[in-house]
Amino acid sequence: LSLHDALPIWLAGWKRDELPLQQGDVTLPEGEFDATFDAHVVKRLTDVLVVSHEKTAQIVDARPAPRFNAEADEPRPGLKRGHIPGALNVPWGDLVFEGELKTTDELRAIFERQGVDLHRPIIASCGSGVTACVVILALATLGVSDVTLYDGAWSEWGARDDLPVEPAK
């Protein structure tokens, strides 16, 4: 399930809640937004490689299980099948229902079932650094704050021949 595939799910939730829908051109007022980058919440490939070896944090991969388990090809050509050694799989689609995060009890149960310790540091990853943010949002909802993003994600790791991959082929 990609972010694009999830749009109908979110739209179904919007319609279910009877929120307004319209068609036509959209004109938005101009506005200002000052973005700030916090480098401490983004991990680089070398950081993730060290964590994979030393187990100082948990790597949580948000991709669907068939991709994580090397049972399905990646949507991006040239990427290996599999996952970062030691990573845990929490597919982002399991965390939402009809476009909304599941309840905190459901979220907690999902992370627990997948072996994620909510009291240890977590690095979230996925295919391209986008859907990992759903994992980060779910963790924030549970009050988990020691969470970072590996935005290079599988599109970076899976393209390299010099990095370990599980399951080993």
Predicted regions: what they are:
Residues A6-Q58, A62-K169:
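Rhodanese-like catalytic fold shared by cysteine-dependent sulfurtransferases
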